[in-house]
């Protein structure tokens, strides 16, 4: 039986992981309240890349301001976030790890006090006081996910992963 964990893994886009160890996206709550990258989050993630992960994924990065799921969440919903993401992607890649950002919208799980408004969902959900999105808002959400992916590409990430679990907007 061969050990494949230490073997490279190539993707069709041309990126290659030096090994098959991947850092899962975790909730760090270390970034600034406006979604910009903090030194703490940068240090935490680049330290993991330095530790030998073949792929290092960021924590969930929200694609709309009203999609924030927790305090200190990294954002990617505005061009003000690009500088920090460029720094982070470069810092991760400097250690030989692929850099991937997780795109996220907390949907009905966005705390009202955190987003200063009512959470949104595919339909009204009384349990979470979430209101259903209008068709126009669905189209805007689609555009915002695409724009976030473009910001990730501009920032130098090797890829994106879309968070679709836990009752979030794309569950």
Predicted regions and their residues:
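Aromatic side chains
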Residues: 42-44, 77, 145, 157, ...
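Generic hydrophobic/aromatic pocket-lining and core-packing "Φ" positions
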Residues: 45, 89, 149, 157-160
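Glycine-rich, flexible loop/turn motifs
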Residues: 5, 70-73, 116, 121, ...
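Short beta-strand segments at enzyme active-site cores
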Residues: 56-59, 99-104, 155-169
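General structural feature for long, well-ordered alpha-helical segments within catalytic domains
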Residues: 81-84, 88, 134-137, 141-144, ...
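Non-globular sequence segments
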Residues: 98, 104-157
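N-terminal capping/small domains of soluble enzymes
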Residues: 1-104, 141
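Short acidic/His/Gly/Ser-rich catalytic and metal-binding motifs that mark active-site loops
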Residues: 64-68, 110-113, 169-171
């Amino acid at each position: 039986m061969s050990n494949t964990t230490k073997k490279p893994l190539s993707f069709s886009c041309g990126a290659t992981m030096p090994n098959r160890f991947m850092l899962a996206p975790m909730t760090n709550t270390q970034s600034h309240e406006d979604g910009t990258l903090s030194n703490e989050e940068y240090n935490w993630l680049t330290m993991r890349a330095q530790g030998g992960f073949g792929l290092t994924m960021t924590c969930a990065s929200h694609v709309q301001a009203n999609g924030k799921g927790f305090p200190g969440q990294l954002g990617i919903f505005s061009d003000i976030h690009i500088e920090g993401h460029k720094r982070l992607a470069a810092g991760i890649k400097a250690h030989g790890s692929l850099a991937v950002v997780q795109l996220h919208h907390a949907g009905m799980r966005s705390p009202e006090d955190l987003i200063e408004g009512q959470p949104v969902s595919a339909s009204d959900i009384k349990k979470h006081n979430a209101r259903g999105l209008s068709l126009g808002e669905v189209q805007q959400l689609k555009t915002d996910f695409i724009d976030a992916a473009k910001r990730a590409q501009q920032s130098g990430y090797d890829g994106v992963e879309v968070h679709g679990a836990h009752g979030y907007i794309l569950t």
